[in-house]
Regions:
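C-terminal substrate-binding subdomain of Rossmann-fold SDR/epimerase-dehydratase oxidoreductases
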Residues: 1-129
Length: 129
């Protein structure tokens, strides 16, 4: 089933970009936020020394573009059952990665087409199909 007729947008992020971000962040020791309080605190910081960062491509892609990239990489057309949007679903989501970029100067860049192609090649090689 393809909901909202494939018109929803999602932030697809290639695994190598995620690994690169984690590697860059691992050596940055977070500092406690002395101004943090339960009442006014952000879930990304606290009085304990930790930080939470979004790792994403920050470039939402229509679901149909993702499906098309998969079809091209596999060399076959998917059987698609187009459906209306489901109650409670959202049309567009993406990650705010500015804090990550500000910290380590990294923003994921791998396109959906390139990432899907790389994944399909890896999958076929790994499973010898």
């Amino acid at each position: 089933d393809v909901y909202n007729y494939g018109k929803m947008k999602r932030d697809f992020t290639y695994i190598d970009d995620i690994v690169e971000a984690v590697v860059r962040v691992q050596d940055v020791i977070p500092q406690a936020n002395a101004d943090w309080t339960v009442e006014s605190g952000s879930p990304a910081t606290s009085s304990a020394p930790y930080r939470v960062y979004n790792i994403g491509n920050s470039s939402p892609v229509e679901l149909m573009d993702y499906i098309t990239a998969l079809e091209e990489a596999l060399g076959m057309e998917a059987k698609k059952n187009m459906m209306p949007i489901q109650p409670g679903d959202v049309l567009d989501t993406s990650a705010d990665t500015q804090p990550l970029y500000d910290l380590v100067g990294f923003k994921p860049q791998t396109s959906v087409k390139e990432g899907v192609k790389n994944f399909v090649e890896w999958y076929k090689d790994y499973y010898q199909i």
